[in-house]
Amino acid sequence: MRVVILGSGVVGVTSAWYLSQAGHDVTVIDRESGPAQGTSAANAGQISPGYAAPWAAPGVPLKAIKWMFQRHAPLAVRLDGTPFQLKWMWQMLRNCDTRHYMENKGRMVRLAEYSRDCLKTLRAETGIKYEGRQGGTLQLFRTARQYENATRDIAVLEDAGVPYQLLESSRLAEVEPALAEVAHKLTGGLRLPNDETGDCQLFTQRLAHMAEQAGVTFRFNTPVEKLLYENEQIYGVKCADEIIKADAYVMAFGSYSTAMLKGIVDIPVYPLKGYSLTIPIVEPDGAPVSTILDETYKIAITRFDKRIRVGGMAEIVGFNTDLQQPRRETLEMVVRDLFPRGGRIEQATFWTGLRPMTPDGTPVVGRTRFKNLWLNTGHGTLGWTMACGSGQLLSDILSGRTPAIPYDDLSIARYRSDFAPSRQQRLHSAHN
């Protein structure tokens, strides 16, 4: 089967790899000059299935109000008055109760755990190198309440069979020696020993090269104008004066998926702006061994070979990609506070990207009402964590094979009543 994939980020490239391995003739289209030039370029670098959790959580609405008045707040909102933003935020608020949180986190952990298994298999079969480490993740708590609240997440971890260690502050240095100097500032931590880290951009670029050698065609510097469709079936992708045809089409454009599908399939994927710093390491002993998650500021600090990646925060500001100096100051403050000897902050590279987020935090993976249009988008802050599993899952569904995990609750059907274009809308769009 001929398959066109729209998007060459980590999700698009893993989809291409697994579909190619299943015997399909795959073409990837992207406006960028190469793979992983957008959100996959400089994310936090963590592969953390156990910490897969929605931003929509109990207490977040009240916290969001408090964060409005804090300099180093992890979340910022700028209302633009658009119906889509308001509808998306309302949907997110509706998911901020305990029942929805547990349900959403459960399916996110399911997909993320499966994805880690897929990555492990891929690594063993191909030998792909991406500055990966298998040293686990350590979530740090600064207050007694944070430490106590960890029991809520532990219940989900136990249900999913995810191993963990709940550590008091005196034991943090056992897994992250550099924290010995700052343990007095912390109340404890939750460690997931099976989690991993790695450079997402490097992985994506090298996997794209392997996919190309396996027969995948990459069409870079090729902006997509629109999808062409009739009778609820896609019949081509319009790119300037060219129409690229296939038997099946996969939307993996991240935050830009929503606009590209307007009038065809409405999906609740909104750009959640995040930031990162990439810092050269000065003293290896003063840097983290693996990944640290600061629960207070929602910031991750990840060790690569000779660099530290500090990433986090969320801004609901539309497609704005301006680099905000106060956000850099927050990232610098956290890494200086926890790893004062870790790296040369003055030489850091500052970056921002747009994560494609759904209101419930779970991606949308699977077929749409269109017979040959498939989705693999909406992974939010967990695109790197979920990419391999999502790609393998999509390949299995599209190929008619039985997937290794349940997947019905990952499809767009769960949003159909709230995000669905009318028949009149679709007919109008089809004739424009």
UniProtKB/Swiss-Prot annotation:
**Keyword Cell inner membrane tagged:** no
Recorded GO molecular functions are: D-amino-acid dehydrogenase activity
- Cysteines joined through disulfide linkages: none
Q: Which reaction does it catalyse?
A: a D-alpha-amino acid + A + H2O = a 2-oxocarboxylate + AH2 + NH4(+)
Asked if Nucleotide-binding is a keyword of the record, the answer is: no
Q: Cite the binding residues for FAD.
A: 3-17
**EC number of this enzyme:** 1.4.99.-
Query: Keywords of this protein's UniProt record, alphabetized?
Result: FAD, Flavoprotein, Oxidoreductase
What's a single GO BP term from this record?
Answer: D-alanine catabolic process
Q: Identify one Gene Ontology CC term for this UniProt entry.
A: cytoplasm
Q: What cofactor requirement does the entry state?
A: FAD
Which pathway does UniProt place it in?
Amino-acid degradation; D-alanine degradation; NH(3) and pyruvate from D-alanine: step 1/1
Q: Which family does it belong to?
A: Belongs to the DadA oxidoreductase family.
Record function comment: Oxidative deamination of D-amino acids.
Please report the name of this protein according to its UniProt entry: D-amino acid dehydrogenase
Q: Which source organism does the UniProt entry give?
A: Salmonella arizonae (strain ATCC BAA-731 / CDC346-86 / RSK2980)
